[in-house]
Swiss-Prot record:
Its main location: cytoplasm. NCBIfam families: maf (TIGR00172). The keyword DNA-binding does not apply. It comes from the Bacteria. This is Nucleoside triphosphate pyrophosphatase. It catalyses: a ribonucleoside 5'-triphosphate + H2O = a ribonucleoside 5'-phosphate + diphosphate + H(+); a 2'-deoxyribonucleoside 5'-triphosphate + H2O = a 2'-deoxyribonucleoside 5'-phosphate + diphosphate + H(+).
Amino acid sequence: MTSFVLASASPARLAVLRSAGVEPIVRVSGVDEDAVIAALGADAAPEHVVTELARAKASDVLPVLARDGISDAVVVGCDSMLLIDGSLQGKPGTVDVARARWSAMAGRSATLLTGHSVLRIAEGAVVGDAHDHSATVVHFASPPDADLEAYLATGEPLQVAGAFTLDSLGGWFVDRIEGDPSSVIGIGLPLVRRLLAEVGVGVAELWASSGRVD
């Protein structure tokens, strides 16, 4: 039996997988994202940055799986960042940063990049490695100050890439998107399907499982 592992603490990613019929085993990555970005260098392409972060997260949980006795697994790691004005933005962390970002992106469009990494593990060894990124254009509304302050006060935008969500309160302030909605939420089902195929796993194998594929 091969376990299906999500290398992320994101409730949104878990919800996407569950709504698509998959109940993964969750093992949270402890990757130092700033260190990974610094190692890539200032000239690294934004698409490369999010993809390498996703790869680092997937790889980081492998020792945990070995410790837990999980030697056959499909591991999925993801990382999302918002590209606006040539700059990549992750989680704002504070109300002031989130407010400044909304001031810059209100009424405009930006690109949400999500890196994806799929590792196939058999008998404790990596036997398949597929990775890529998705890019979705997000068109933002211009929320009134009162609505924006109320949104900031919820704390939701502080811990999500780009200071917004599509599937929760932030969805009120997104006019439309061009691309895959699940990628904006944090894990793109179309891309994961393709990457799983590259490592020899079909999505239909996952539907009837609870954290495992035959």
